[in-house]
Amino acid sequence: RFNHLYGETLVVPEAIIEDQVAVIPGLDGQKMSKSYNNVIPLFAPEKQLRKAIMKIETDSKTVEEVKDPESCNVFQLFQCFADQSAQQDLAEQYRAGGMGYGTAKQICFEAIRDELKDASEHYHQIRGDHAHLEGILEGGKDKARKVARDVVDRVRNKVGL
């Protein structure tokens, strides 16, 4: 509305969301959300992460039965962390039958653990170094203050203040 009245002044941000990971499934297959109490703690200790992955809800098909990867919560989560080749391999195993959901969950856990290993280590390092964390926050505050000051100045100029 401001831009309509005063000309292009404020930039409306655009979301950058990949279609295949627009919604990350939680433990119950719904979108992952604290509100739904179905969050997978990605930076939790390995044992806790594995325990959460093993709780993902699946259907009651037996090990021998052919499974549909596209309708499986485990596979949907796996797609967020595995490369195309690994996704194709797991999809073929689903369609061939002979693989249980426990095996699929273990494969999913390993993919998540491996993909997030460096990020998890960095997260825990930062969380443990309060002085470094304060420095990051201060830097962010200064950067945000400068950007905000520039925006406020542009707005004031447009409205004549």
PLM features: residue spans?
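Conserved nucleotide- and phosphate/pyrophosphate-binding catalytic cores
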Residues: 1-161
